[in-house]
Design a protein with these regions (language model features):
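Post-signal-peptide N-terminal segment of Sec-exported extracytoplasmic proteins
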Residues: 39-67
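Bacterial Sec signal peptide processing site at the extreme N-terminus
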Residues: 14-34
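C-terminal partner/receptor-binding element of secreted or periplasmic proteins
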Residues: 130-152
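Second-shell loop/turn segments in exported
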Residues: 37-40, 125-137
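Sec-dependent bacterial lipoprotein signal peptides
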Residues: 1-17
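Mobile beta-alpha loop/short-helix "lid" or hinge segments that flank ligand
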Residues: 20-27, 112-120
Length: 154
């Protein structure tokens, strides 16, 4: 009986907390811009993730309409080695250069850089998968910053 009461009370509190998904259709309407054209150069994996996140803004044309040219690079840097010369710590650094055009005229240009440090793994397959996941997460962070910057361009 106590479990049912606890579950019921928990359900009431959680349902009224006001949670909304960040990229819901309702929240994308808060940003009064659209993207008419996207072009990408550079790291394919990062570009695909950015394109996936920006697709919400290409659906309908609004008053403020941007054309984006995105150039991305990603590099893996060795931070530390052990006595045998094997790498023990790495850092993935992702840099995205964005040219924002409005009506065929350069409106803004900015660079967003993110990095993440991690330790080596003896299982190379798991290490590769972990690196891919890190790159995807960095691309998500960069995309969130990009959307915020686009919303603030006057």
């Amino acid at each position: 009986m106590e479990k049912k009461i606890f579950t019921f009370i928990l359900l009431i509190f959680l349902s009224s907390c006001g949670y909304e998904a960040i990229y819901s259709v309702k929240n994308t309407k808060n940003y009064d811009f659209s993207i008419s054209k996207l072009s990408f150069i550079g790291d394919r994996e990062i570009n695909l993730k950015i394109k996936q996140k920006l697709n919400n803004y290409t659906q309908e044309i609004k008053d403020i309409n941007f054309i984006l040219k995105i150039t991305s690079t990603s590099e893996k840097i060795i931070l530390a080695k052990n006595d045998a010369g094997d790498s023990t710590s790495f850092k993935i650094k992702t840099i995205v250069n964005i040219d924002v055009y409005n009506k065929e005229k350069l409106k803004s240009n900015f660079i967003i850089a993110e990095s993440f440090s991690y330790d080596n793994n003896s299982n190379k397959f798991e290490l590769k998968n972990y690196e891919k996941e890190i790159k995807r997460n960095l691309a998500d962070i960069i995309t969130e910053k990009l959307i915020f910057k686009l919303a603030n361009i006057k």
